[in-house]
Amino acid sequence: MSRLLTRFDELKQQNRAALVTFITAGDPDYATSLQILKGLPAAGADVIELGMPFTDPMADGPAIQLANIRALAAKQDLAKTLQMVREFRQDDQTTPIVLMGYFNPIHKMGVERFIAEAVEAGVDGLIVVDLPPEHNEDLCDPAQAAGIDFIRLTTPTTDDKRLPVVLNGSSGFVYYVSVAGVTGAGSATLEHVEEAVARLKRHTELPVCVGFGIRTPEQAAAIARLTEGVVVGSALIDQIANAKSNAQAVEGVLELCRQISTGVRSARA
């Protein structure tokens, strides 16, 4: 069983949702980012999404766009992002890591080489936001053949006709974007999320993780009662952006992660 499915299985037995945390690789620099990455599991992260920096992250809001700019300024690239995963795996063999980003850097590296290196580094899943299911053969199919899950985004505008197409070939989990638009935007109403999760569950047996707009332990707890996973990204990235030093960035991210984790873990208690 994959690391992702194993983790969701464990959490189901514990009757709690996963806390899925997002950071951008190399933000604000390689060493600090690696320190944050290595600290996230102990701070309560159950699954980690690691952003692959790209020059044109059009699906992301201002916070993550700025994180991409900081990481690229610090000379982060896809090879270094894979190296970060290798270094993380020296200490942690159980926490799933999902690389999230855009197809261009993968295409430039070469799909075959990228998949081989991702497997060797210990990557568990991919979210590639600009690669629709009509292009499964470009990356989804070969990635899954190599044992890497391919996770799809669904949104409030994904209708019942489109949903089976989007879910075709999905594995690992389904990422529900609770607010149509860019990441980090406002938060959705709980009723809306509950209805959306129920609709997804009619189409898939995969765990559903809900993200976008979750910034507090209370919001995370409310979502954790409704679904298998809570995704937090922009709120963590803001801790890096607002920090006066790299040490403060590390502590800010990990402390917020601890607080949100407490909310998620107490949600169904």
UniProtKB/Swiss-Prot annotation:
InterPro entries per the UniProt record, alphabetical: Aldolase_TIM, RibuloseP-bd_barrel, Trp_synthase_alpha_AS, Trp_synthase_suA
GO annotation, cellular component aspect: cytosol
Cysteine-cysteine disulfides: none
Keywords: Amino-acid biosynthesis, Aromatic amino acid biosynthesis, Lyase, Tryptophan biosynthesis
Pathway entry: Amino-acid biosynthesis; L-tryptophan biosynthesis; L-tryptophan from chorismate: step 5/5
One family name in Pfam for this protein: Trp_syntA
Domain of life where this protein originates: Bacteria
Active site residues according to the UniProt entry: 49 (proton acceptor), 60 (proton acceptor)
Recorded GO MF terms: tryptophan synthase activity
Top EC class for this record: lyase
Catalytic activity: (1S,2R)-1-C-(indol-3-yl)glycerol 3-phosphate + L-serine = D-glyceraldehyde 3-phosphate + L-tryptophan + H2O
Lipid metabolism in keyword set: no
EC number(s) from the headed UniProt entry: 4.2.1.20
Similarity section: Belongs to the TrpA family.
Quaternary structure note: Tetramer of two alpha and two beta chains.
NCBIfam families found in the cross-reference section: trpA
Job description of the protein: The alpha subunit is responsible for the aldol cleavage of indoleglycerol phosphate to indole and glyceraldehyde 3-phosphate.
Full protein name: Tryptophan synthase alpha chain
